[in-house]
């Protein structure tokens, strides 16, 4: 409640809060414009802090410029100050446990995630000799899966090379828990343990985001991420039961920041997955789960998990991207 009026001191930038973490963001292609606007806004921030008898440690305040590799910024010519201290740009920042780099390619986050998952593998490699498989699975979900799933609908948009790094670590983890040889195939092991692969974990979290959108369970800002096809195109009444849950695919201008955007990726994945309006969970069409019959989030996640596990029995390289 104490800082809910912070945004009122800003006129040209946007801000966000989570607990004691606050960010200010501004968008411009001109370095001098960025310098002028940010310096002006930071002066207003200082005034607001003084009026509210608060202080901010400039040494812990970080500055980052987001840009593509093709459009670099000469940082040395951009002077941004906070309370007399110049803020030097950094290559990446940590916000809410996510490492966000200046190119938005998630390389730094994947590197840090790899270290955490490697440590988890080390713990499991020692624990497996003194604990049952059930205990190892509990530890897997506690110290491996919990890190893996956090924010994966965002960092999952990273490069194929980065996904492969995490994929290798997950397969190693599966082999460790089951005492399987280092080069053994893992499809049967994933099915045996009831664990889905990292690529499918990413897909499931992205599909889950769309599911929440369709059921109006997202915050208002995130509800603007997607648009129903029926709100853009005229749909015949007889097709409404299926098409009214299909998403409009936005037009994109760039490959890097268009096709890899969460808006485009989630919409494309959802429409592809539910092209027929039903989900195959065991190969028998009679047991297909129709989209309109999935009433709860728990049922949705359970259905998607069954679908992905079944896919490992058909094609080991089946990926929904």
List each language-model region with its residue ranges.
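Active-site palm subdomain of RNA-directed nucleic acid polymerases
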Residues: 1-26
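Short, well-ordered alpha-helical packing segments
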Residues: 3-7, 23, 39-46, 118, ...
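Secondary-structure transition/capping motifs at alpha-helix termini
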Residues: 9-14, 31, 52, 180
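Short hydrophobic "helix-edge" motifs at membrane interfaces and signal-peptide entry regions
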Residues: 9-11, 85-88, 93, 184
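Non-catalytic, peripheral interaction segments enriched in hydrophobic/basic residues
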Residues: 18-19, 50-70, 95-227
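Short, conserved micro-motifs composed of acidic
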Residues: 40, 55-91
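Short linear motifs embedded in intrinsically disordered, charge-biased segments
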Residues: 161-321
């Amino acid at each position: 409640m104490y800082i809910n009026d912070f945004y009122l001191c800003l006129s040209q930038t946007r801000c966000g809060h989570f607990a004691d973490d606050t960010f200010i963001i501004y968008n411009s292609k001109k370095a001098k414009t960025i310098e002028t606007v940010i310096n002006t806004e930071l002066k207003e921030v200082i005034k607001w802090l003084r009026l509210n008898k608060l202080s901010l440690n400039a040494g812990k305040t970080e500055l980052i410029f987001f840009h593509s590799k093709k459009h670099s910024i000469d940082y040395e010519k951009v002077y941004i100050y906070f309370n007399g201290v110049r803020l030097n740009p950094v290559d990446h920042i940590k916000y809410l446990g996510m490492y966000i780099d200046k190119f938005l390619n998630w390389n730094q986050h994947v590197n840090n995630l790899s270290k955490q998952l490697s440590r988890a593998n080390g713990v499991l490699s020692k624990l497996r000799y003194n604990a049952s498989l059930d205990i190892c699975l509990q530890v897997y979900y506690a110290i491996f899966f919990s890190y893996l799933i956090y924010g994966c609908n965002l960092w999952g948009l990273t490069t194929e090379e980065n996904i492969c790094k995490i994929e290798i670590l997950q397969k190693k983890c599966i082999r460790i828990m089951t005492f399987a040889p280092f080069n053994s195939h893992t499809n049967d092991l994933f099915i045996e343990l009831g664990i889905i692969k990292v690529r499918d974990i990413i897909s499931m979290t992205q599909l889950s985001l769309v599911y929440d959108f369709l059921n109006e369970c997202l915050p208002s800002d995130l509800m603007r991420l997607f648009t129903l096809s029926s709100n853009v195109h005229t749909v015949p009444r007889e097709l409404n039961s299926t098409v009214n849950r299909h998403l409009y695919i936005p037009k994109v201008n760039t490959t890097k920041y268009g096709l890899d955007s969460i808006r485009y990726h989630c919409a494309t994945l959802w429409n592809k997955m539910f092209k027929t309006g039903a989900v195959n969970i065991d190969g028998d069409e009679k047991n297909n789960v129709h989209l309109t019959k999935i009433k709860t989030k728990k049922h949705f996640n359970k259905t998607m998990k069954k679908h992905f596990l079944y896919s490992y029995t058909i094609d080991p390289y089946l990926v929904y991207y």
